Swiss-Prot record:
Keyword Transmembrane: no
InterPro entries per the UniProt record, alphabetical: ASFV_MGF360
Gene Ontology biological-process annotations: symbiont-mediated suppression of host innate immune response; symbiont-mediated suppression of host JAK-STAT cascade via inhibition of STAT1 activity; symbiont-mediated suppression of host JAK-STAT cascade via inhibition of STAT2 activity; symbiont-mediated suppression of host type I interferon-mediated signaling pathway; taxis
Keywords: Early protein, Host cytoplasm, Host-virus interaction, Inhibition of host innate immune response by virus, Inhibition of host interferon signaling pathway by virus, Inhibition of host STAT1 by virus, Inhibition of host STAT2 by virus, Interferon antiviral system evasion, Viral immunoevasion
Family, per entry: Belongs to the asfivirus MGF 360 family.
Function: Plays a role in virus cell tropism, and may be required for efficient virus replication in macrophages. In addition, inhibits IFN-beta-induced IFN-stimulated genes (ISGs) transcription. Mechanistically, degrades host STAT1 and STAT2 through apoptosis and ubiquitin-proteasome pathways respectively.
Protein's recorded name: Protein MGF 360-9L
Length: 353
């Protein structure tokens, strides 16, 4: 049955994917993007296309359409409620600028408007959206006009200990988006960055270790053959607490020293990691106490003085598949931490030698 234009439009607006036989009509009606139909969810204010397979905010879709100089979609998205002022973030030709003016765009965005869009769009954690964020922001001269301190504060909060001092904003932003892709295992975005930024292969490895992404760590080691000094890898894995997956992979799969992992965790004061290493078999308690005292962490030294710890035999030391490792550690709780906690509640640690 041939549907009317009105019915087709309603299907698009109601987020119903039209049948293959209707694609020609959708192309003729301008409801076509990235070699596929456009779907719009009116309540969520999100657009779906063959590129934005997980959906994207309509304002972000507008910015993408402006960047591509797609006049029909600029008009369409504006009619659907997109804020035409955000076109200023990606406009790159005078003809497109004139069209946006006709649609009501102002001459310049205020600083708070740019930061608002930045904060809004980065919360949409999909691979296609992170790629869009990189395309729009990483080399955008409009960011030179806003407060660098505020923008860097947003970036530092996300990257934490991964942050490096650099005055080159474009490089900082590229690492920021790449790091987010690895943290949330957005494989589409990860592969996008990997193919374009060969000099950031080690950055991807650092992010995989720091953000506990054992799947990406496994791919980097088995497929991409990206390498780093093993002690450096342990430092990145142990820098963040509860990084059980990447610590397990480094020590059990790749053969890193469990006691060194415990020492690094002591330096970073990450108790969860310390007890995980003990559960896996770390036993250099005297050396660990020395590291603790050297780093002014006497509480950890007291914890390590308890003579009650042993390897947790329920943890398999033979797994190499990331999926199996994740499943094994999903509900993991440290038996040695439980014993230390019970001792502390009953006796405290003040009188331990």
């Amino acid at each position: 049955m041939v549907l009317s234009l009105q019915t087709l439009t309603k299907k698009v607006l109601a987020r119903q994917y039209p049948a293959q036989c209707h694609h020609h009509f959708l192309k003729c009606c301008g409801l076509w993007w990235h070699d596929g139909p456009i779907v719009y969810h009116q309540n969520q204010k999100k657009i779906w296309s063959s590129f934005f397979t997980d959906g994207v905010n309509i304002n972000a879709a507008l910015v993408k359409a402006v960047k591509e100089n797609n006049y029909d979609l600029i008009v369409l998205f504006t009619e659907w409620g997109a804020n035409i002022d955000y076109s200023l973030l990606s406009v790159n030709t005078e003809c497109t600028r004139d069209l946006c003016r006709e649609l009501g765009a102002k001459e310049q965005l205020k600083q708070q408007e740019v930061l608002h869009f930045f904060n809004m769009v980065k919360r949409d954690l999909t691979g296609s959206n992170i790629i869009l964020c990189h395309e729009v922001f990483s080399h955008n001269p409009i960011l030179e006009t806003i407060n660098r301190t505020k923008l860097r504060g947003i970036i530092y909060e996300q990257l934490e200990a991964l942050m490096e001092n650099t005055d080159i904003l474009s490089e900082l932003l590229t690492k920021y988006w790449y790091g987010m892709a690895v943290e949330f295992n957005l494989t589409k975005a990860i592969h996008y960055f990997y193919q374009r930024y060969a000099h950031l292969h080690q950055w991807r490895l650092m992010c995989a270790l720091f953000y506990n992404n054992v799947f990406d760590l496994h791919e980097l080691y088995t497929k991409e053959k990206v390498r780093m000094d093993m002690d450096e890898m342990l430092k990145w894995a142990c820098r963040k607490n509860y990084n059980y997956l990447t610590i397990y992979y480094c020590c059990i799969v790749l053969g890193a020293d469990l006691n060194k992992a415990m020492f690094h965790s002591i330096q970073f004061y990450n108790l969860g990691n310390i007890f995980f290493c003990i559960d896996l078999g770390a036993d250099a308690f005297e050396e660990g106490k020395t590291v603790a005292y050297q780093n002014d962490k006497s509480f950890i030294a007291s914890i390590l003085s308890l003579n009650c710890y042993s390897k947790n035999d329920s943890l398999s030391l033979k797994e190499t598949d990331p999926e199996v490792i994740k499943r094994m550690l999903k509900d993991y709780h440290s038996k040695n931490m439980s014993m230390a906690h019970k001792y502390y509640i009953k006796y405290g640690f003040d009188n331990i030698d």
